[in-house]
Amino acid sequence: MKQYQSYKCNKCGNVVEVQNVGGGELHCCGQAMEMITKDLTSVVLMKAFAGESMARNKYEYFAKIAQKEGFRDIAEHFQRAANNEKMHAKLELKAYNVLNYDKEFGNTSENLQYAIDGESYENVTMYPEFAKVAKEEGHADIARLLDMIGKIEIEHENMYKSLKHRLDSGKEHVSDEEEEWICEVCGHVHRGKKALKVCPVCKHPIEYQSRLNSKK
């Protein structure tokens, strides 16, 4: 038995993660639980990734507080550390992906699907369950907050679905109807069913032309 290994009850489906290693076996429903962790390195990489990601966000919040309080040097230290944590998280996620999928990151279509799945889990399962816990413990304001955030995740899921459909159908820079396309570099606006291959003003290529209505 090792710390962070997960064990499952084959009768009720209960899963527990080992925090403190002791002797003997883990039991549930009158029987020994089965160890289901196949690769502990993957588990600790994801824990490290989560920890570094949280630290990065916290340090950025702390940097803004220090900035408001007039401690500019401390703010810079917080921000520098936040940037370091971001890189640590990236390295850990890349290592996890290589270990499990033989590549550092997926392509954009695959990443959009990953985002869709994540947002779906958040709005269907995670936030409703978290809001229920807060409500049961008498934290009505927190329950409402979690519920409202969960509804926002529905919009995120729909946004990613729309983007993936557009990308997969080859219409990232093509539309069935006339639209306004804006150059993200100089702001030139063109109306038509296709984005311009090259901006006539600043000469940036089609990659810098996007739908104006998606920016509003």
Language-model regions: role of each:
Residues V15, Q19-V21, E34-K216:
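Non-heme di-metal
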Residues M1-Y4, K38-L40:
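Extreme N-terminus of proteins, especially the signal/transit-peptide cleavage junction
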Residues Q5-Y7, V15, H27-E34:
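N-terminal alpha-helical targeting/anchoring segments
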